[in-house]
Amino acid sequence: MNSPAPEEVVSALLDAFEGRDFERARTYLSDSEFIYQSPIESMSSADDFIANISRVGPILERIERVKTFVSGNDVCNLLRVHTTMDTLNATTTVQIATVVAGKVTAIESIFDATEYNKMIVPHEQD
């Protein structure tokens, strides 16, 4: 049985994220080997990743796919992630995903985390 092409798997994963179907999104991630890395967090569990990303669901408007590059098992997407938040209404993101045997085993997201960090890190009071 042939596995789907890496680009198809990653596209389906992004479709599931955009549709806020996190249960379906989980089916595209490897059960035995998964790692996620971004400027604001990293994790090594697909279940933890889905639990975390599902919290973003309420503010996600759409994922604009600007350009896709494929090299073997690696899929690189240039994305604009649109949210309902004024300060983060369109975040340009580079996402690199590795697909093995039809499952995503690694995702690295690269973006300017300045506004995210302002929400996470408390500001010092003068």
Per-region residue spans from a language model:
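C-terminal and inter-domain tail/linker signature
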Residues: 1-126
